[in-house]
Regions:
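C-terminal PAP-associated
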Residues: 20-457
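Bacterial Sec-dependent N-terminal signal peptides
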Residues: 1-22
């Protein structure tokens, strides 16, 4: 397997801390909305509206903001396709195809917003705009697809569903589904379903969290999720009505939910944390650091950065220290100084068209924690070639003073987009990961690829 070009490996042992005053709501009690059994209420006709682009208001404002930053960087760092600053490659054994399954078929919804979870019992479940699909790999049985449209209808909500996520809890052997509904403060809900069994295709206990979480005329967009030892965490961006996700941003929030309540179908015990700021500015797109080989707790960490930057070295690490109601609970916000700058990524050219694969921005796409070490990824522009690569950061907090290392990987040809990272270690202290990403170039149709990284780089 060919290895991506390694551009930089540096260490940074400097961290700056900033006292913050995040706000935690009083403990909330969210009643069970409904038990939904996917097998009993499956879709026969799979209704869908083709060529539907899920609405985000004022796309012109979106394009203007993003285009201005990218245009500046395009001029400063012009694209030089098929070039990299390093040609070093590491030989690895050819990958073996083992258990495999067909991916989600394109259903004409944009964006796809795919997410996937696999249980210890080999149950695979994927979600996308706008469907839930399950398969038992032990029996090779498909347990149908269930549209989020029908799920919203069964919950008495309008057909405005988007941004689905699915998480598997290996400690409790359960699945958790999250998706959003509605695009204004008066219609927006965060829907959370906890599976009653260890399958993803049975009954779920569904709850509706208010999208206007702070009751101040805002609505929730872009959820990210992680399960901890005691609690389930959902982050989201609060937006103003009739505004885009870029220009209408107010702040990011964190929902903290006692997960056992959801599994048992009881009233949820929950809190929402807000005012997660640094130097007076809200920290945007909080990405939970999931557990690597297993869940951790009672605390939870979150990553963020400056996703619209023309160039910076700030990485934000947010720490929720304990479970709901603990006297030791606190929210700490630190800015880690990265050893290398990152930049807003360039969009990816495609063959035979002037249209490009849009890469949005440099937000943290995924992160995990294994022991006292974190790994995370996002897209960043390479200033030497103008191409977009995968920024792979690592932070070690074992000494009490975070130490950060970072690499930027470029595909052999063209650019990368939308990276993700998964822990792949087996033994204690193992830092092996798999990083997957999309790629493309003016001479290369978009596709997907993956690399393996271990303690030796």
């Amino acid at each position: 397997m060919k290895r991506l070009s390694v551009l930089v490996l540096l260490l940074a042992g400097v961290i700056t801390s900033q006292a913050q005053s995040p706000v935690s709501s009083p403990v909330m009690h969210i009643p069970l909305k409904k038990v939904v059994n996917l097998q009993q209420e499956g879709d026969t006709w799979f209704p869908m509206l083709k060529n539907l682009h899920l609405p985000k208001p004022h796309p012109g404002a979106d394009r203007a903001l993003v285009a201005s930053v990218k245009a500046e960087l395009d001029t400063r760092y012009p694209l030089k396709e098929n070039q990299s600053t390093s040609s070093a490659k590491i030989n690895a054994a050819a990958p073996l195809v083992m258990r495999n399954f067909q991916g989600n078929a394109f259903n004409f919804y944009l964006p796809n917003d795919n997410d996937l979870a696999v249980s210890n019992g080999n149950v695979v479940s994927s979600v996308s705009n706008t469907m839930i699909f399950s398969k038992d790999l032990n029996t090779n049985s498909v347990y149908g697809s269930y549209t989020l449209h029908s799920l919203c209808a069964s919950l008495g909500l309008a057909a405005e569903e988007f941004d689905p996520k699915i998480t598997y809890d290996p400690e409790n052997d359960r699945f958790i589904v999250v998706f959003l509904n509605g695009f204004t403060d008066s219609t927006n809900n965060v829907l959370v379903g906890f599976s009653q069994t260890n399958t993803s295709y049975g009954a779920y206990n569904f709850y509706s969290l208010p999208g206007d979480a702070l009751n101040n005329g805002l609505w929730t967009d872009f959820p990210m999720c992680a399960v901890g030892e005691h609690d389930f965490f959902i982050t989201g961006n609060l937006l103003y009505n009739d505004s885009s996700w870029q220009t209408g941003f107010n702040q990011s929030i964190i929902w903290q939910i006692r997960k056992d309540d959801g599994y048992q179908g009881n009233t949820l015990t929950a809190q929402v944390h807000s005012n997660v700021f640094y130097n007076g500015s809200p920290i945007r797109n909080l990405c939970p650091a999931k557990g690597g080989s297993g869940v951790y707790g009672p605390d939870m960490y979150f990553f963020s950065n400056r996703n619209f930057t023309t160039g910076t070295d700030s990485i934000f690490l947010v720490h929720l220290t304990d479970t709901i109601g603990s006297p030791n609970f606190a929210i700490n916000v630190d800015a880690v100084i990265a050893p290398m700058y990152y930049h807003m990524p360039a969009d990816v050219p495609q063959p035979n068209t002037v249209d490009k694969l849009i890469v949005n921005d440099a937000r943290t796409m995924a992160a995990f924690k294994e022991g006292d070490k974190f790994q995370f990824v996002f897209a960043s522009r390479d200033t030497a070639t103008g191409n977009t690569g995968v920024y792979h950061g690592r932070i070690d907090i074992s000494t009490g003073t975070p130490v950060m290392a970072a690499n930027l990987y470029l595909p052999p040809t063209g650019s990368a987009a939308y990276p993700n990272i998964s822990y792949a270690g087996i033994n204690p202290g193992d830092e092996k990961v798999v990083i997957n990403y999309l790629y493309g170039a003016s001479t290369l149709y978009p596709g997907s690829a993956a690399i393996a990284w271990d303690n030796n780089g």
